[in-house]
């Protein structure tokens, strides 16, 4: 087991000695020893009158004035040892420094004037008003109002009449993962009742035009006029999808309603994090924040933004100390049954699996369940142009290699984001990784269960990236490792002794034959592995843990189960039965755009998709769906 991370040492400062004449000061410690006992699982509102501890930011970190009798000690000095990189990376960032702090007014001149020296010495004197005013009080996070998390930036939204292409361009232009969609007929900016468009909707759009989704898999209950017959609704849906395949514009509202989501929950900006934490801890990805009157949305709060806020302000929330220093195994959070995709399966299969499972990410593994990488629903944006459409029928590993090479070109350096931890990793380290990688989940691996070929290779590798089971820095697999293996996998698929590779792949997809272990590629040893995949920890798990600490009951799978129930509703099943009885919809039939209903194969899919990738809706240079 990895020892609990130790704190960073505080640099000695003359200011500390002059401002703490009444005994040693206690410094807020989120990673100290002895570890505090777990807080009681109940919600206890805090007030300013009962606060006994305040912290003051300095150039070396944060210090606090602790009331007599307080047992809350955070950082402990260990002069005999140096702080490890793991401890540093597991520690929350320091609180912001006040620009008016007198320490920033010290003159750097070699010949400072007498008056300036005098003013400086007076400003550093004990009991300085500036220091007192700069104190950060330690608070209960559950009492934080949502106004503290509402950004002043203009809220970006679109109208339901916008096309899918326009909605996609809005995400790209503003670097968003979702955007509110107004459904008001009178005011296009009215978000009182709204939907959301995200990359899962774009994935649905792509799969539809590729003939990869059956009518029975769609949520058509809310499509069109509620008073129309099942036959009329079926005709409307198929006609609209045919328009998409021909490259014509399709309203974004149509695609959104085909892909079930959780209700768009709203909170007043006067509400606190107490209730919001419960909602997001139950698997809802984002909520809307409204003004006091409740008639205008002022912001969107997502799981990712909330976890970043909690991390950046962790030193203000002493109740988090116990959890941040505990390991995943101790806290018993996370799932032991992550959804995966094999490295040699096609990318289109991964996208379809995310659609079916209603998840936004898959772990990429080899046949020995060694974690290879990660594929996200956001990655679908990289295959919306005709020049990249061939990647849909390449291996997932090949696509990961492409993403890494593109990232290297854009940022000018080789990178491999750390998307994995182990059961002995502290929650503080997990949150730090989630914030740094802007991820929604981290895969849990067991490094002791690596394949023998990997063990021997890693033993001979001087920079294996492992330190007592803890991954430090950017570990292998490096870009070159993934690229080399991707080439080997692709090469092996092109040298089948039975039949030509292209014909074999097309035949396999055309007949609907799934990729199995028997058709897998030869076993290429992955010499820079991470370990066996044993679980996954998500933002939902962590936020649910925080909510549970305040007495709230959460179920991390609640929102996902609701989405799955929506996708298989009895209402839609009854519609399908009615259509089948009338001879309109054969059982299990796919939505098609030609007379060949059975052709959902590789060659047919490429032909169908070529229209959407080449059709120019606006200006070619502005349209992500046009040929590049």
Curated annotation (Swiss-Prot):
Q: Which GO terms describe its biological process?
A: cellular response to glucose starvation; regulation of mitotic metaphase/anaphase transition
Q: Where in the cell is it found?
A: Cytoplasm; Nucleus
Looking up Pfam families in the UniProt record yields:
CBS
- Domain CBS, residue spans: 258-319, 334-392
Show the ranges annotated as biased composition (Polar residues): 15-24
Query: Which GO CC terms are listed, alphabetically?
Result: cytoplasm; nucleus
What name is this protein filed under? Protein SDS23
Organism from which the protein derives: Candida albicans (strain SC5314 / ATCC MYA-2876)
Gene name, Swiss-Prot/TrEMBL: SDS24
